[in-house]
Every structure is written in structure tokens, then in C-alpha cells.
A protein has these predicted regions:
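Dynamic helix-loop-helix/coil hinge segments at AAA+ ATPase domain boundaries and subdomain interfaces
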Residues: 1-19, 235, 252-256
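Conserved ASCE/P-loop NTPase catalytic core
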Residues: 6-190
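Amphipathic alpha-helical interaction segments
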Residues: 20, 24, 44, 160, ...
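Short, mixed-charge aromatic SLiMs
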Residues: 48-54, 251-252, 287-298
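Helical "lid/switch" subdomain of P-loop NTPase nucleotide-binding domains
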Residues: 153-157, 196, 200, 204
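Amphipathic alpha-helical segments in well-structured domains
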Residues: 158-161, 205, 283
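Conserved C-terminal "switch" segment of AAA+ ATPases
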Residues: 197-201, 214-262, 275-280
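Conserved C-terminal helix/linker of AAA+ ATPases
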Residues: 259-266, 272-298
Length: 298
């Protein structure tokens, strides 16, 4: 619902138009493209989508299939929720210990993603198999970040998702040679700085019903971001210095705003103040220093 979405994104500045686009996309549970210029929060949005689903889930620690053992619970991607064992309101001491309660998972794979991570892989020493990423992210969100920059060709990666996106189940090959069908019950998000139509053909785009552009923040949103980031960086907000920054390094340069820049520029100003051994304070001189370095090749 809209209220769930607002709560999930309460720590981000998201305008109404973006919320209204994200809501139906999340409810569909099918898949979405998040695209736009780098630094505008695509990954931050994707990371918070799972919060809108709410609550927690139970998953088996491992799966046993005809002699093959597949480890599903992964402390690297799953956050275990520890319950009271009998002293609290609910007595969970009798819960089958083969199951574990976790926060709904958000699994993020970036440019380092390889095809082997999407298949069952067996450890040759222990003979125990590792579940693929899409199995670990069931009942949550799988984010393919920096889509189009993986080492494998884009069409190879896309072909891997055609059946799961269409049928809501996936096929996995086990080391024994057996093929099994598993649920594909999750939202998959492709996040990219590139134009989707330049990456994939129309047939695949049809299977991703929601394509949402994450645009540049407005000037008002940019100012709001600075005001939020200032105390987090140890600064008091200085309207005159902020106006100087915007007038000199944005309006005069015809430079677009990016959501990441308040944080990045304030970090530069902070380092400048530490180096000069002066109080941490916004100033035109400090913003000139930060902008000259930050925008030198941009």
C-alpha cells in the first residue's frame, strides 16, 4: 500500500511521482528496470523495496534432494532473527531447528556477477552445494546492479531470466545430473546507468512491465539533501554558502544536480577543513575547493 511504501522510503527523499510509479511495480512482483544517470539513488531505492513487503520469513537451512545437499541459508546475504526460546510471549523452543527465521532478503549482484552464481555449485571438498542467488532471494528482492556491465554478454544474462520471469519458477541442474524445478517468487530489479532499449530487445522488455527512470533531483530537493547531510557530516547548514555553491557551480556551469553530490561535496569540504586546521564550516572558499576537484573531469 501507499503507507507501506512511504514507511519503507522514509529515510530517502522521493517525490510523489516516483512513489506512484514504484508502488504498482512492487505490487506486481514481476520485475522492473530502474534506469537513469549515475548517482541519483537507483541502488538506494532498490535496497529499500523489500521493506515495503514487510515482516519476516522462515526458510530451510538446507535442502536435501536425492543425496545432494544444497545450503540455502547464507549469513552473508540473510539476516537471522533470533527469537525467545520460551521465556517470552511466544514459546518457540519447539520450532524445527532445520528452519531459520530471517528478514525478507535483498540480494544485490553487481558487475562482478558471473553465470556460476546463478547455478548450483558444489564444493569439491565437502560435496555440499551452494544455492544460487535467485534461490537465496526468494520471497524478497534480487537486484542486478550495474546491469550491462557484467563480464558475460547481456543476451546470455537475459536469456537466463526469460523462463523465471514468465513462469514464476526456475530450473536448476544438480551435480548428479538431475534437473529440479524451484519457485521464483521474488521481485527482480535491473538497475542500470544505460538506456534499457540500447541493452535489450523488445521481446525481453515486454517481460519487464515497469521501466522507471530515476531522474535528477530538483533544486529544492538538492537543497533539502544538503540540509539533511550537513549535520551527518558535522556541519551547520549555511544558506549563503549553499546559495553560492548552486549559483557558481551549478547555474553558471549549467550543471545538472545529482542526488549523491551533497554527500560527496560535504566530504570534500570536511577534508579541506581538517587539512587547513580550521573549524568545520561551510564557506565559498571550501566549496570552490571541493567543486574544482570533484567536477574536474565531469
Amino acid at each position: 500500500t501507499e503507507s507501506n511504501l512511504r514507511e519503507a522510503f522514509s529515510d530517502l527523499i522521493i517525490n510523489e511521482k516516483m512513489l506512484d510509479r514504484l508502488g504498482p511495480a512492487i505490487n506486481s512482483g514481476r520485475g522492473m528496470f530502474l534506469f537513469g544517470e549515475p548517482g541519483n539513488g537507483k541502488t538506494s531505492i532498490a535496497e529499500r523495496v523489500t521493506k515495503a513487503f514487510g515482516s519476516s520469513i522462515w526458510i530451510p537451512r538446507a535442502l536435501g534432494i536425492d543425496g545432494d545437499i544444497i545450503r540455502l541459508f547464507d549469513p552473508g546475504v540473510h539476516e537471522e532473527l533470533h527469537e525467545n526460546d520460551g521465556d517470552g510471549l511466544f514459546d518457540l523452543s519447539g520450532v524445527d531447528q532445520r528452519w531459520v527465521k530471517i528478514v525478507r532478503p535483498t540480494v544485490i549482484a553487481g558487475g562482478e556477477l558471473t553465470m556460476s552464481e546463478l547455478e548450483v555449485v558444489q564444493n569439491l571438498q565437502t560435496k555440499i552445494c551452494e544455492a544460487p542467488l535467485q534461490l537465496k532471494s526468494n520471497c524478497g528482492t534480487l537486484v542486478i546492479d550495474d546491469f550491462g556491465r557484467q563480464t558475460m554478454p547481456v543476451d546470455v544474462l537475459l536469456n537466463r531470466w526469460i523462463v523465471p520471469l514468465e513462469k514464476r519458477y526456475d530450473f536448476l541442474n544438480l551435480p548428479s545430473g538431475k534437473k529440479i524445478q524451484v519457485p521464483f517468487d521474488q521481485l527482480i530489479i535491473f538497475s542500470t546507468n544505460l538506456e534499457p532499449r540500447d541493452l535489450v530487445d523488445g521481446a525481453f522488455l515486454r517481460r519487464i512491465p515497469y521501466k522507471i527512470e530515476v531522474g535528477d533531483p530538483s533544486e529544492a530537493e538538492f537543497r533539502q539533501l544538503i540540509d539533511i547531510m550537513a549535520p551527518m557530516s558535522g556541519f551547520e547548514s549555511d544558506p549563503e554558502s549553499i546559495e553560492y555553491l548552486i549559483e557558481t557551480h551549478y547555474r553558471a556551469a549549467n550543471r545538472p544536480f545529482r542526488a549523491c553530490q551533497p554527500r560527496d561535496l560535504l566530504a570534500q569540504v570536511k577534508n579541506y577543513c581538517v587539512y587547513k586546521e580550521i573549524p568545520k564550516k561551510m564557506s565559498p572558499e571550501a566549496f570552490d575547493f571541493a567543486a574544482e576537484i570533484y567536477f574536474s573531469v565531469m
